Amino acid sequence: MFPIFLQMAVWRPSETKVYLPPTPVSKVVPTDAYVKRTNIFYHAGSSRLLAVGHPYYSISKAGNSKTDVPKVSAFQYRVFRVRLPDPNKFGLPDTNVFNPEQERLVWACVGLEIGRGQPLGVGVSGNPLFNKLDDTESSTIANQDTAEDSRDNISVDPKQTQLCIIGCTPAIGEHWAKGTACRSAPPAQGDCPPLELVNSPIQDGDMVDIGFGAMDFKTLQESKSDVPLDISQSTCKYPDYLKMSADAYGDSMWFYLRREQLFARHYFNRAGAIGEQLPSTLYIKGTNNRDPPPSSVYVATPSGSMVTSEAQLFNKPYWLQRAQGHNNGICWGNQVFVTVVDTTRNTNMTISATTQTLSTYNSSQIKQYVRHVEEYELQFVFQLCKISLSAETMAYLHTMNSTLLEGWNIGLSPPAATSLEDKYRYVKSLAITCQKDQPPAEKEDPLAKYKFWDVNLQDSFSADLDQFPLGRKFLMQLGVRTKPSTTTKKRSAPSSSTSTPSAKRKRR
């Protein structure tokens, strides 16, 4: 006999991880999928836009909270909020363009040109009390900082920037600000605060990065002497290209133009107590006044270098064929946001005025002033488009932006009331409680709390493209050549004549 061994089967779970597919999300549809473009184009342009002010700070007279001289600097963002007419209320040459019961009209931006006036110039910014200890580029033997105040009068020519961002919502900026410390480890007085990256819309008048970083200098530099005057109490923002490029709908940035340039001109170190001591393993201990070592907090002053007309982004047309996001130039809300920075026209004009008539030169009797001026002009070419009011399209637009349907006078039906409501017959009777008429709620502007330069183009649309510089350039792109009319009208016959009419020849 042979022994028979029976082995029990034991089930063991698989050690291989199983990855489940992610939960399906709603797909973002590009505007070209539901927007139908027509062959109707319009030109719209602004007037000459001027700004004059002090380049470093705003000025208010004593005892007056009103700003008498605003701050106008080339290192500020210029954010133009361009308002367009409602195409559904627009007087169209052809009334058969669309069916108002089944379609709605929108504008599409297909071309623009940002005009800049004033000559090229290099602007200088600085601080009369700049935190500078040693010239670490060409320094003699550096010793300990023994003076209580070693600040110096330093000026720089900041970073050179040309920037243009186009979209139908404000551009998004980023900067570093003071964060919130944990309650378990609160910082002591004089400790380095925690940092936090903050995103916020770029507003008109916000400061651009000039070479000292994108940060909130008012809260992170309490000495007020680490940067030039124009940003020492301001926040420098840098466009968050990553966030705007990843925007699902692509409204904040259809496309952008950018050119930045700088190099380090001088190298200094900061005066003051070192908050984080230099590790002893990184150096050999010195003698006399070289122990401990001098300040190791270094800073470089930027320089934007030469400005030239060969590297200009402005005063030339740009045509939008394909946007970087899903919004291919559709102006939702009948508005366009143009964010501009141009530091190549940065001349700060110095103005002098004498307090009395001078026979000999005396600087104490001459007052010096500084002003900065800016000049802009905006031109656009818009294309008329229409959207079919299908159920799928309206549901998608309501998910994207619920205010669009309200602007088109399309409302969603409210749910049916489940409770019994009271309705009086005689509403104005004195026998019942007062029935106050509730006025309709005014439509609030969600961007009213932000500051923009409003440009109203509602009365500037024209279908005669050949009458405007940008319109003629656009027609050249399409290969359309307009010929001037050379036909002359015939002179009308005089109503009365003093000459004797000639006798008609009789036909024989």
From Swiss-Prot:
Pfam families: Late_protein_L1. Residues 481-508 are annotated as: Disordered. Residues 481-502 have a biased composition (Low complexity). Coiled coil: none annotated. It is found in: Virion; Host nucleus. Gene3D superfamilies: Major capsid L1 (late) superfamily, Papillomavirus. One of its GO terms (cellular component) is host cell nucleus. Its main location: virion. HAMAP family: PPV_L1 (MF_04002). Self-assembles into homopentamers. The capsid has an icosahedral symmetry and consists of 72 capsomers, with each capsomer being a pentamer of L1. Interacts with the minor capsid protein L2; this interaction is necessary for viral genome encapsidation. Interacts with protein E2; this interaction enhances E2-dependent replication and transcription activation. Belongs to the papillomaviridae L1 protein family. This is Major capsid protein L1. It comes from Human papillomavirus 30. The lineage of its organism: Viruses, Monodnaviria, Shotokuvirae, Cossaviricota, Papovaviricetes.
